């Protein structure tokens, strides 16, 4: 049965899925990387597709921006459609001098300014951590492909404009700031499924460097390749 936000029938979504924030990036991935891709969702413009990649059945779907949005879709994908492996492929802003525009960042753990997780844990901070097996595979896949990749802590912020002091955050070793991974990692722990965030640096908060919206939608293919290869890895 369809959910309030996903119109797919049972069986139309694979148990492995890529989750870009931008639904047009989901369409780009389906059109350029998947064979026999079929669209399973367009509710609220959040496009989703299922196809095959190197003979493996996989899906890709947009999530929108922020932890509330990705949490809605990830919850429904896990609880209603049986998805077991979810990899976010999105953009992030660097807060580290050694992490440059178009580099990849794999988030080993995600701090957050969001209060959503505190609804379940009001008395202490619950750590949002990626699935180590997926992280390890993604890192080695990226290295084998010769892609500049950093592994470390990231920050999932509720604010795109404003938010935590970038210099202070960077001094703590945080690699980048984005808006979704902590929520996805928390749901991974809650439902005992595999989750990971692979981000491309689209902006450098310290230097002011940036990429265009068209670049963010259409050219960050390294992240897509690493995400797909990790998704189908044994």
From Swiss-Prot:
- Residues bound to phosphate: 21, 25, 44, 88-91
Question: Which species is the source of this protein?
Answer: Lactococcus lactis subsp. lactis (strain IL1403)
What SUPFAM superfamilies does its record include? Purine and uridine phosphorylases
Protein's UniProt name: Purine nucleoside phosphorylase DeoD-type
In the record, what terms sit under GO molecular function? purine-nucleoside phosphorylase activity
Annotated a purine D-ribonucleoside binding lies at 5, 178-180, 202-203
Q: Which family does it belong to?
A: Belongs to the PNP/UDP phosphorylase family.
Q: What gene is behind this protein?
A: deoD
Look up keyword Transferase and say if it applies: yes
Per its record, the protein catalyses: a purine D-ribonucleoside + phosphate = a purine nucleobase + alpha-D-ribose 1-phosphate; a purine 2'-deoxy-D-ribonucleoside + phosphate = a purine nucleobase + 2-deoxy-alpha-D-ribose 1-phosphate
Tell me yes or no: is Iron-sulfur among this UniProt entry's keywords.
no
Q: What Gene3D superfamilies does the record tag this protein with?
A: Nucleoside phosphorylase domain
Q: What does this protein do?
A: Catalyzes the reversible phosphorolytic breakdown of the N-glycosidic bond in the beta-(deoxy)ribonucleoside molecules, with the formation of the corresponding free purine bases and pentose-1-phosphate.
């Amino acid at each position: 049965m369809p959910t309030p936000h996903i119109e797919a029938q049972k069986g139309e979504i694979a148990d492995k899925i890529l989750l870009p924030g931008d639904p047009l990036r989901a369409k780009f991935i389906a059109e350029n990387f998947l064979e026999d891709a079929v669209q399973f969702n367009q509710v609220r413009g959040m496009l989703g597709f299922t196809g095959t990649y190197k003979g493996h059945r996989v899906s890709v779907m947009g999530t929108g921006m922020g932890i509330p949005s990705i949490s809605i879709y990830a919850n429904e994908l896990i609880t209603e459609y049986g998805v077991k492996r979810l990899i976010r492929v999105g953009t992030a802003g660097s807060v580290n001098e050694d992490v440059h525009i178009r580099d990849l960042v794999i988030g080993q753990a995600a701090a957050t300014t969001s209060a959503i997780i505190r609804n379940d844990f009001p008395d202490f901070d619950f750590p949002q951590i990626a699935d180590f097996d997926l992280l390890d595979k993604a890192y080695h896949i990226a290295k084998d492909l010769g892609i500049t990749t950093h592994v470390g802590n990231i920050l999932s912020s509720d604010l795109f404009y404003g938010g935590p002091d970038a210099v202070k955050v960077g001094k703590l070793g945080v690699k980048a700031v984005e808006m979704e991974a902590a929520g996805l990692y928390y749901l991974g722990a809650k439902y005992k499924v595999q989750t990971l965030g692979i981000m491309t640096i689209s902006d450098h908060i310290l230097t002011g460097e940036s990429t265009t919206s068209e670049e963010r939608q259409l050219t960050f293919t390294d992240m897509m390749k690493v995400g797909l290869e990790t998704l189908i890895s044994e």
